């Protein structure tokens, strides 16, 4: 594997809470750059205009900084190959699309969403994987010009060889062969003029002189499209490395429905960023038992991409807890520990906001732990009996919790007003009084029916912590339902 003049990148999409999987891939790239004296670049891939938000972009940058990762170039600090936000690079992509059209490597497609869905349904019914059937491939230049002049919506798709296979060497998987007839005629430029991930990432990687592309294994099947684009443009392709996905202990894909996946969740609960990076870094090195506690510098020294395993990286929270505890006890001095605790308590003004809400609700300072302590707890230790005093039957409580969890994910800006508005809307949709809906939420979020105002508490705790507490509450109530 050539490593001269190494430039690597992490290119997250700002469409939600920053995922630990992003930290996992970012850390690999960061360590790879450090190992080879290269440069680590941050690029924001916000081609999904409907889901990307400045708020989530800020959270991505803050989360990666909290992890202790530093980039040489990025949207916040600039660099010689900017802009580093794909939406700001939009004018750059169209000329490359026109080049592909002129060379006969791409074509305009006028198929409507309805027609494409009918096509996919027919393919699925026939037991075939859905992919574009090439209807617009045979359009003449005159037909294309006429339909565009008539104002028909068009996208640009890439042409794919009809036979043979794409053979390449991956830095992790070794020699890979993917038949061309399994590769879709990918949309390159969407109807709004924005490029898809496949088009933008190839162009950006080339223009930013990226030498090694390390990303999750879910992109392995897309490599033929990317290699083909490099060939169409006459560019040298980077070295591809596809890392095994992080998985739960049961080998299922890591997802927020089963375990907390957002970096902010671990930050909010008081995990040490060095411990989280230590935990993730262990997936990239080989060590003996007893050598697990490692700083970033030590991880970099032991890092060897040649020894990567294709086996899934198991995200074992118990091991993370163990490692985090060792960091607190063995790596932090008494002064550092006290400083970390104070910084954590004041993070996002959580403690200050809790004190402000508590002041008018207590008669003695000693009442604070019972009233506001839930804001700083990692685990409320909810039991089925905690919900027994709620007037609603357990079946109704469980229905409320299971309805609220996914609906809260629809909130774009997480604050008191949006939380209240969504919960009121949920109550209306369920045909229930707001009090009936929020009563179990008080217990789920704070562990008690007497607590600080619910909407304020949820806003202070943050989306990721609330998500996890609602999930654990639903499990407790499900046990109550099952015991009847």
From Swiss-Prot:
Gene3D superfamilies: 1.10.10.350, HUPs. GO terms for molecular function: ATP binding; glutamate-tRNA ligase activity; tRNA binding; zinc ion binding. SUPFAM superfamilies: An anticodon-binding domain of class I aminoacyl-tRNA synthetases, Nucleotidylyl transferase. HAMAP family: Glu_tRNA_synth_type1 (MF_00022). Monomer. Keywords: Aminoacyl-tRNA synthetase, ATP-binding, Cytoplasm, Ligase, Nucleotide-binding, Protein biosynthesis. One of its GO terms (cellular component) is cytosol. InterPro entries: aa-tRNA-synth_I_cd-bd, aa-tRNA-synth_I_codon-bd_sub2, aa-tRNA-synth_I_CS, aa_tRNA-synth_I_cd-bd_sf, Glu-tRNA-ligase_bac/mito, Glu/Gln-tRNA-synth, Glu/Gln-tRNA-synth_Ib_cat-dom, GluQ/Sye. It catalyses: tRNA(Glu) + L-glutamate + ATP = L-glutamyl-tRNA(Glu) + AMP + diphosphate. Signal peptide: none annotated. It comes from the Bacteria. ATP binds at residue 256. It comes from Rhizobium leguminosarum bv. trifolii (strain WSM2304). Its EC number is 6.1.1.17. Its main location: cytoplasm. The keyword Ligase applies. Belongs to the class-I aminoacyl-tRNA synthetase family. Glutamate--tRNA ligase type 1 subfamily. NCBIfam families: gltX_bact (TIGR00464). This is Glutamate--tRNA ligase. Transmembrane segments: none annotated. Catalyzes the attachment of glutamate to tRNA(Glu) in a two-step reaction: glutamate is first activated by ATP to form Glu-AMP and then transferred to the acceptor end of tRNA(Glu). A motif ('KMSKS' region) lies at residues 253-257. GO terms for biological process: glutamyl-tRNA aminoacylation. CDD domains: GluRS_core. It is found in: Cytoplasm. It holds the Pfam family Anticodon_2.
């Amino acid at each position: 594997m050539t490593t001269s003049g190494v430039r690597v990148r992490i290119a997250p999409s700002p469409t939600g809470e920053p995922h630990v999987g992003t930290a996992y891939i970012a850390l690999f790239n960061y360590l790879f750059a450090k190992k080879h004296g290269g440069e680590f670049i941050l690029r924001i891939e916000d081609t999904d205009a409907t889901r990307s938000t400045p708020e989530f972009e800020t959270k991505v940058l803050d989360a990666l900084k909290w992890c202790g990762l530093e980039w040489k170039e990025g949207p916040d600090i600039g660099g010689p190959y900017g802009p580093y936000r794909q939406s700001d690079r939009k004018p750059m992509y169209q000329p490359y699309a026109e080049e592909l059209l002129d060379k006969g490597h791409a074509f305009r497609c006028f198929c409507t969403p309805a027609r494409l869905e009918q096509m996919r349904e027919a393919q699925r019914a026939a037991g075939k994987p859905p992919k574009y059937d090439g209807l617009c491939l045979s359009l003449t230049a005159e037909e294309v010009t006429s339909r565009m002049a008539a104002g028909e919506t068009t996208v640009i798709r890439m042409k794919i060889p009809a036979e043979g296979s794409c053979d390449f060497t991956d830095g992790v998987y070794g020699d890979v062969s993917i038949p061309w007839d399994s590769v879709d005629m990918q949309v390159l430029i969407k109807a709004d003029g924005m490029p898809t991930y496949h088009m933008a990432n190839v162009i950006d990687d080339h223009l930013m002189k990226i030498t090694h592309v390390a990303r999750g294994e879910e992109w392995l099947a897309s490599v033929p499209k990317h290699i083909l684009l490099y060939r169409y443009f006459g560019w040298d392709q980077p070295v591809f490395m596809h890392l095994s996905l992080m998985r739960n202990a049961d080998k299922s894909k890591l997802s927020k429905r089963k375990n907390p996946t957002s970096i902010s969740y671990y930050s909010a609960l008081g995990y040490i960023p060095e411990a989280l990076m230590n935990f993730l870094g262990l997936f990239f090195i080989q060590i003996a038992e007893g050598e697990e506690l490692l700083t970033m510098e030590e991880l970099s020294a032991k890092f060897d991409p040649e020894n990567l395993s294709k086996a899934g990286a198991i995200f074992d929270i118990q091991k993370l807890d163990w490692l985090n505890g060792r960091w607190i006890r063995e790596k932090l001095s008494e002064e550092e520990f006290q400083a970390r605790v104070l910084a954590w308590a004041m993070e996002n003004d959580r403690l200050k906001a809790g004190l402000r809400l508590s002041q008018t609700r207590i008669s003695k300072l000693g009442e604070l732990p019972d009233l506001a302590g839930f804001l700083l707890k990692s685990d409320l230790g909810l039991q089925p009996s905690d919900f027994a005093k709620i007037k609603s039957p357990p079946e109704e409580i469980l229905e409320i919790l299971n309805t609220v969890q996914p609906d809260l994910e629809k909130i774009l800006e997480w604050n008191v007003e949006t939380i209240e508005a969504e919960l009121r809307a949920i109550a209306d949709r369920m045909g229930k009084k707001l009090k009936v809906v929020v009563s179990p939420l008080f217990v789920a979020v704070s562990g008690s029916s007497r607590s600080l105002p619910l909407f304020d508490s949820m806003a202070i705790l943050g989306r990721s912590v609330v998500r996890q507490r609602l999930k654990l509450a639903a499990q407790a109530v499900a046990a109550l339902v099952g015991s009847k």
